[in-house]
Design a protein with these regions (language model features):
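Conserved alpha-helical substructure of the radical SAM core
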Residues: 1-115
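Short loop/turn motifs at secondary-structure junctions
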Residues: 24, 58-59, 112, 180-183, ...
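Radical SAM enzyme [4Fe-4S]-AdoMet core and its adjacent flexible, acidic
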Residues: 36-37, 89, 109-111, 119-121, ...
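Structural motif corresponding to alpha-helix initiation and N-cap regions
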Residues: 43, 73, 99-102, 125, ...
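Residues embedded in well-ordered beta-strands within globular domains across many folds
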Residues: 64, 117, 185, 224-227, ...
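Flexible mid-to-C-terminal extensions adjoining Fe-S/redox cofactors in radical SAM and related proteins
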Residues: 276, 283, 300-301, 305-382
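Short, small/polar residue-rich loop motifs at catalytic or cofactor-binding pockets
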Residues: 286-290
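Short, acidic, Ser/Thr-enriched surface-loop or helix-capping motifs
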Residues: 295-296
């Protein structure tokens, strides 16, 4: 993935096919509703949008069909099949509701969907059901994970981490391992949508969680983050620190981590034992608007699902034109940032969360307030 020219094409195109969803998750980016919203792309408009993805040229980006709940769209399988017929890879992110039947699971497989992502936000019903807003949803989700694995999908668990559930992270890893899930994508909460009512982690807690995720990836688990690009710095530091270790614990030799890290790693090793693989933390150098682009239910294009700055609309112009030429996206890809992010030696590989910068300051190019790292350029001034 590193060889792709992100100025020309993204790796992933997220399409919010609908906002309709039966759940009421407290951290959701969308203000989800139970009926389709007026203005959603029609089948014909959605087909033209899918067709336009070929204008990026090969290799085509992966189309991730999300929502709301993708299964609330009656044409979603036909649209996925159309994308596959064009050679566009497709992933889906269905909600765990009564609509996720065995028939629809088979339907996803029949139209060529290979990767399915499911949200799991707690290691117990007490945590997960409180966040998802539906009693019994935790048990349904664990069953859904196992059903999808048994159906042959590559299954990814999405977890939105916040103060309400951060202590559950080791238990979520255990559930994933027991269910045969090999990919974990951890979303660091942003104050948008209903997420305004949930609690973001502090910079120190974000650092502790990032180091914990690196540890978790050594349990034969591919780990990625969303809106926490500083994880890439942590991965680079940890790999370098391990290589330089003099035999002492490289984490304690190189880093000043807090009690949260200690609790999470102690719990992880208590549940799963020592590492069983080399760390599989996955970083690709993408960020909002760089390798990633988001198309909303009404065709409006945003740098990412958590960055509500409208860039254009696929009803009016091809997505490739918006992605390649919009001034904000050019600035993001050129790492033209302000504050600490602007002088940081990791600004190209990391670059901070543009969504979080905007949510806190109204400026998408400002520094990421969740990062506690002091760039070398600033450290030398002290």
């Amino acid at each position: 993935m590193q060889s792709l020219d992100f100025d020309q094409r993204p790796i992933l195109v997220f399409w919010e096919s609908t906002r309709a969803c039966l759940l009421a998750c407290k951290h959701c980016r969308a203000e989800a509703i139970e009926q389709p919203m007026e203005g959603e792309l029609s089948t014909a408009e959605a087909t033209r949008f899918v067709d336009s993805l070929t204008s990026f040229g090969r290799p085509y980006p992966v189309l991730i069909i999300t929502g709301g709940d993708v299964l609330m769209r009656s044409d979603v399988f036909a649209l996925a099949q159309h994308a596959r017929d064009l050679g566009i890879p497709v992933g889906m992110a269905p909600s765990v509701t009564p609509r996720l039947t065995d028939e629809r699971i088979a339907g996803m497989r029949d139209v060529g969907v290979k990767v399915v992502s499911i949200s799991l936000d707690g290691a117990s019903a007490a945590t997960h059901d409180r966040i998802r807003g539906v009693p019994g949803h935790f048990d349904d989700t664990v069953r859904a994970l196992r059903r999808l694995v048994e159906a042959g999908f590559q299954v990814q668990v999405n977890t939105a981490v916040m103060k309400d559930n951060v202590e559950d992270l080791p238990g979520i890893v255990e559930i994933m391992k027991q269910s045969g899930v090999g990919i974990w994508e951890v979303f660091f909460l942003i104050h948008v949508g209903r997420g305004r009512d949930a609690s973001e982690l502090s910079p120190a807690e974000c650092e502790d969680v990032a180091h914990f995720l690196f540890e978790a990836s050594a349990h034969d688990l591919t780990v990625r983050t969303v809106e926490a690009p500083a994880f890439r710095r942590v991965v680079a530091e940890r790999k370098e620190g391990s290589a330089e270790s003099d035999g002492r614990d490289p984490v304690r030799q190189h880093y000043a981590l807090g009690a949260l890290y200690d609790r999470l790693t102690t719990r992880l090793y208590g549940l799963l034992g020592p590492p069983v693989s080399h760390p599989k933390a996955q970083t690709s150098g993408t960020r909002d608007g760089k390798g990633i682009i988001f198309v909303a239910h009404d065709g409006t294009v945003y740098p990412a699902g958590f960055l509500p700055i409208a860039l254009g609309n696929v009803r009016d112009q091809p997505l490739s034109e918006i992605y390649r030429h919009h001034p904000l996206l050019r600035d993001i890809r050129a790492a033209n940032f302000e504050g600490r992010c602007g002088v940081c030696e990791y600004r190209n590989g990391c670059g901070g969360s543009r969504s979080r910068a905007y949510a806190h300051s109204g400026n998408a190019l400002a520094e990421d307030p969740a990062c506690g790292y002091t760039p070398q350029a600033l450290a030398l001034e002290r």
